[in-house]
């Protein structure tokens, strides 16, 4: 069978069309470092690290060796019914060392969506264990994205992603404004913006009645929402509000965790310790699916003998020994090669290099970044204060492919999330490619505006 015949049976998430690229062209066969190759041998710069997941880069033989060794020794046994396995126990201990504060107890799962589901379940069960069953509601952020299950879609702050699934069977979810968006910013300083949104969160909890709110869940930086980077001070205010009103704080670190923002975890930019932390993606760099919910001691203490068997249900693959072995090898690479620091250094270099190339283009409203999360937000030159037509921005997906790199363009934003192992020369290469792509788009917008003016 040809590749085309095989692909007919694969139900992919086709969110963009690439007119000049066939499905066979987009079948990726191998990867090394920041690059991937399709079946025809075409090299592409993976400027989105798969889905912001391949933190250590492609082709790491150390992880493959760890997986091979573990499969030969013990390919599978779950962490349920008091059973465990060495890789799961070792990884839980390692996470207790890496995570801030007293986040010391880990419940493993498979995907980021599931980790957030688990975190919400633990939050609800915690209050139930304390004899406060009315505390079941969860507050999330507009523009936020916390997963693709029905439960996590219920807290999703992006209406176009959830409309088809409404109404939700689960009740008790509310969204509040996130303190950053180029198009919704309004007047005032960053401090004013944080204050307004913090007041909005406080008001929402009080309107719902604090005795009915279990948790607030938020991403330190909102990736799928457009790489929104709230001003410093926001996480600290959320922590204070949660403490004041007796509500748990859940940090969704599925994307921001394990070095992506230039710190091991996104909350560390403000020295904040959440009550629960959801992690995935960078825990194994995507080599094998794995996720986790990590809880503070006070939550674990509420469960008999720190056991979650009752009501917080395990799944078949929790604590999978092969996935945990991959994670241990992955974390060793991140630490040994100082990739967290590299994310900070190379992220700053890329931001400066891209900004220097595009800052004079009228269509560029803003370049923003934290570590190796970066976004270009595009503005409509003909309508001040308005984003560029999303169809034009979406064309950047194919424009980037034609230039030889992969990025994600949606709504008004082009997002980049490179592997943490990126080098200075690779940063410069990517900045050049992005600059050329934006130049092409600017030319098209300028020509279109001139054509309309000539007709008028």
Locate predicted features:
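Conserved N-terminal phosphate-binding loop of PLP-dependent enzymes in the Aspartate aminotransferase
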Residues: 1-456
């Amino acid at each position: 069978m040809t590749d085309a015949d095989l692909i007919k049976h694969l139900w992919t998430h086709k969110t963009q069309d690439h007119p000049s690229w066939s499905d066979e062209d987009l079948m990726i066969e191998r990867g090394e470092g920041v690059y991937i190759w399709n079946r025809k041998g075409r090299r592409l710069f993976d400027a989105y690290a798969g889905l912001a997941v391949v933190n250590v880069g492609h082709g790491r033989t150390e992880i493959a060796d760890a997986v091979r060794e573990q499969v030969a020794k013990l390919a599978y046994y779950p962490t349920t019914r008091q059973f465990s396995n060495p890789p799961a126990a070792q990884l839980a201990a390692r996470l207790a060392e890496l995570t801030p504060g007293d986040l010391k107890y880990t419940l493993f799962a498979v995907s980021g969506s599931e980790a957030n589901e688990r975190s919400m379940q633990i939050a609800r069960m915690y209050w139930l264990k304390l004899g406060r069953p009315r505390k079941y509601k969860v507050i999330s952020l507009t523009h936020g994205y916390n997963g693709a299950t029905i439960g996590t879609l219920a807290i999703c702050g992006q209406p176009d992603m959830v409309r088809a699934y409404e109404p939700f069977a689960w009740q008790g979810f509310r969204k509040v404004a996130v303190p950053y968006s180029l198009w919704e910013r309004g007047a005032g300083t960053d401090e004013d913006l944080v204050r307004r949104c913090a007041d909005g969160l406080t008001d929402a909890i009080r309107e719902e009645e604090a005795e009915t709110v279990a948790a607030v869940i938020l991403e330190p930086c909102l990736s799928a929402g457009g790489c929104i980077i709230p001003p410093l001070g926001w996480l600290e205010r959320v922590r204070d509000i949660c403490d004041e009103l007796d509500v748990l704080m859940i940090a969704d670190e599925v994307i921001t965790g394990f070095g992506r923002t230039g710190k091991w975890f996104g909350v560390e930019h403000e020295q904040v310790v959440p009550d629960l932390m959801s992690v995935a993606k960078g825990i194994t760099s995507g080599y094998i699916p794995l996720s986790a919910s990590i809880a503070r001691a006070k939550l674990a203490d509420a469960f008999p003998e720190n056991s979650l068997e009752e009501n917080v249900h395990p799944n078949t693959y929790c604590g999978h020994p092969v996935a945990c072995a991959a994670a241990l090898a992955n974390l060793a690479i991140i630490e040994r090669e100082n990739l967290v620091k590299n994310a900070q250094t190379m992220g700053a270099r890329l931001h400066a290099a891209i900004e220097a190339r595009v800052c004079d283009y009228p269509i560029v409203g803003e370049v923003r970044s934290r570590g190796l999360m970066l976004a270009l937000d595009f503005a409509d030159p003909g309508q001040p204060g308005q984003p560029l037509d999303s169809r034009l921005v979406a064309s950047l997906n194919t424009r980037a492919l034609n230039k030889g790199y992969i990025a994600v363009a949606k709504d008004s934003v082009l997002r980049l999330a490179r592997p943490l192992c990126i080098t200075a020369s690779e940063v410069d290469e990517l900045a050049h490619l992005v600059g050329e792509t934006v130049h092409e788009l600017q030319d098209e917008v300028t020509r279109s505006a001139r054509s309309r003016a000539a007709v008028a």
